[in-house]
Amino acid sequence: MTARRLGRFAIAALAALLAIGATGCMILEMKERELLYRPMRDYARTPADVGLAFEDVWIDVASETGDGRERVHAWWLPSGKPGAPAILYLHGIRWSLGSNLFRIARWRELGFNVLAIDYRGFGRSDGDLPSEMQIYADARAAWHELVRREPHSELRFIYGHSLGAAVALELGATVDDAAGVIAEAGFTSVADLVAESYAPLNLLVSQRFDALERARVLKAPALFIHGTADRFVPPAMSEKLFAVAPQPKKLHMIEGANHGNWNGAGLDDYRRVILEFVASARERVRATRG
């Protein structure tokens, strides 16, 4: 979340407080959702554009009102290799699958089967403006789809970037059949991000994404990754997530990498750390089974 967007939220919050009672709360929450989420309807690029085989997947989810069904769009990118690990890819607060293609392709290059989803309101998924609870529900539904496609728990992993890291930690604290969770460029909570510049407006945040609390109760090994040159999410937040997470866990700071690591800093070490983590997590599941 950029400083400009935080500023817009602060102005919106103060304006909303002028409205009294429930109406004011409703205005504040809706304005917050409008400023926080930046859904993009980007259909232009697909994995085929970078030479990767893929399948369009549609996942049913309950509507926000609970009286109907909506669909979440996903890509399934098979590695074509027997015994390859599978990862659920959860993107950040902006863009859509097409705009995340370069990062999704990295996982395929590492040899993973990849299930990457667009939350409701993003890309080709149904819905307009998502909410925190909807995004969590979308991730859980996508996890069920991954489990259906990959029956072996030692091969199933969860990955999230930025906002997606918070979603990954929530999912990793909920399901008990993931081999590991990888959280990249994660924040401790949206409220903490707001407090960085506009405290005490953090008390008004309804879309909290309290990743710190979810990290405390993770049910799987965790790898936390953060770039030291991240200007959007302080690297210290990943250090805090790491500090509260139960063992086994690992923290890897990428020297010189920005929030999206567009500059490709430390990619060799990035790949090595991920593959070592995955190998260790898989072995741990096997050992647990005896």
Residue ranges and their predicted role:
Residues 20-63:
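An N-terminal hydrophobic leader/cap segment in hydrolases
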Residues 66-145, 149, 172:
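Membrane-embedded segments
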